[in-house]
Amino acid sequence: MASRAGPRAAGTDGSDFQHRERVAMHYQMSVTLKYEIKKLIYVHLVIWLLLVAKMSVGHLRLLSHDQVAMPYQWEYPYLLSIVPSVLGLLSFPRNNISYLVLSMISMGLFSIAPLIYGSMEMFPAAQQLYRHGKAYRFLFGFSAVSVMYLVLVLAVQVHAWQLYYSKKLLDSWFTSTQEKKRK
């Protein structure tokens, strides 16, 4: 295609798309945050499955109590922490704000609250282990309170990041819906 400006008309060489074809920032952010939350949900699922396995072995007495101790009380309500993760996953396909809000609220109730209770429940045993070097519950030869505190710290971090990213995703979705209402 020839023109007076030269062999090719200006703007037809493919360089004119940069000012037109851009994905809105809140859509880019939504995709990124969904991916991060999914990764955290999968890490939470691994923690949850390990906890279920430990509790099953303890209750079914598949191994002696010298190897696997009975579960702490905080572990039972923590089993419900799978509910917020499922609600979070259900909110992703259609950007369902109500499921995401339910996920965030139930995460505080079913995930964070049992972890706080667990840290308080295990504190006397951890204090005794630190001061006197005596442990009464064991998990494959290790002090159960030490192992469970490591799990607890990891779970707190996973849920805190999950809440943080969920809040940012919620803000991103609100931006998107506000722009649609203006049009």
UniProtKB/Swiss-Prot annotation:
Subunit structure, interactors included: Interacts with COPA, COPB2 and COPG2.
UniProt main location, coarse: endoplasmic reticulum
UniProt superkingdom: Eukaryota
One Gene Ontology term from the biological process aspect of the record: negative regulation of insulin secretion involved in cellular response to glucose stimulus
Function: Endoplasmic reticulum transmembrane protein involved in vesicle-mediated transport, which is required for neutrophil function. Required for vesicle-mediated transport; it is however unclear whether it is involved in early secretory pathway or intracellular protein transport.
Modification Phosphoserine occurs at: S3
One Pfam family cited in the UniProt record for this chain: Jagunal
Family, similarity comment: Belongs to the jagunal family.
Phylogenetic classification of the source organism: Eukaryota, Metazoa, Chordata, Craniata, Vertebrata
TM helices/strands, residue ranges: 40-60, 72-92, 97-117, 138-158
Name of the protein described by the UniProt record: Protein jagunal homolog 1
